[in-house]
Amino acid sequence: MDKLFVYIDGTARGEPGEAAVGIAITTPDGSVVEEISRLIGRTTTEVAEYRALTEACRHVIPYEPSSVVFFTHNQRLANYINGVFETREPHIKHQIEIALGLLNQLPRWRLNHVDQKVNMRAPRLVEQAFHQSLQAQATRERMELVLLARVATLSDDAMQRLLDYADRLREEE
């Protein structure tokens, strides 16, 4: 593959809080190669931004592009990765080292700071990860309520069989 454009974003809901990354990998003409939208656990927005960059690198490297242009609306991330500024925060230094280690596996790369309007796709993917998580949680809660309602109507013998069956299911996982 010749050249790829990669749009990245990472956000936490709370500082720290549940965090997600959004990554859009495209060709220069805008054709989508891959989109990543996923929760990454509990962290800060700053760390989530670096995690978006490192995860983007891990997805891009197998395509073996001749060059990659990354886009972020996080000026601080762009400045640190591009060596404009240095951080004194050890946990951020560690994130930078990881990112640079992956970036340097690419033949040519560049990280550009862009206006948030240019980088709209990645934040939408972040929101998609949060939304899917909420939907999954709501679905699970509904299933639990239905299960509780049905269990409440069972006889003691049927409830014991259900408990035995649940134990077998847990052992299989």
Question: Where are the language model's segments positioned?
Answer:
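Intrinsically disordered, low-complexity regulatory segments
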Residues: 120-148
